Amino acid sequence: TLAVTDNTTVGGTLAVTGASTLTGNTTVGGTLGVTGTLTASSIRFNGSRTSVSHSNTNDVTANSLFGTITSTQDALQNHESRSFIVNNSEVEAWDVIILTNQSQVTNVISTVTNITSGAFDILLSNTSSSPSGSFKKKINFAVIKCPP
């Protein structure tokens, strides 16, 4: 059992087997590995962030665990979909990708359709029976690392 009640800094790897409770600020400069239960009031990741622009038909490269992809002006016909590949060296085939729309575009949704080691696909779909009109979309992504 590990209990941290004050501010603590670990410069390398912190490996815990068993229950862990962190009530102070804990900074790990390397890898935090927990086998068991980790209880924390909040967890903050101070990793890299990326923003890239694309034309909705070109693939993009965003090598970080989270970031924002900004499209150039585009439009989708009624019930039309278009996908593009996000090349990302952080992604493994078993990871989970979460998308949120930073800019709201009525009836145009973003979904992840394929995850492979080194890349994932984003599908833009117009769910309406009318054309979408011109739009510029900002999509936030986050990679949740999962064990194989």
Regions found by a protein language model. Give the residues of each.
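Extracellular receptor-binding modules and their adjoining Ser/Thr/Gly/Asp/Asn-rich linkers
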Residues: A15, T21, G33-D95, Q102-V108, ...
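Register-specific beta-strand positions within repetitive beta-rich fiber domains
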Residues: T1-T37
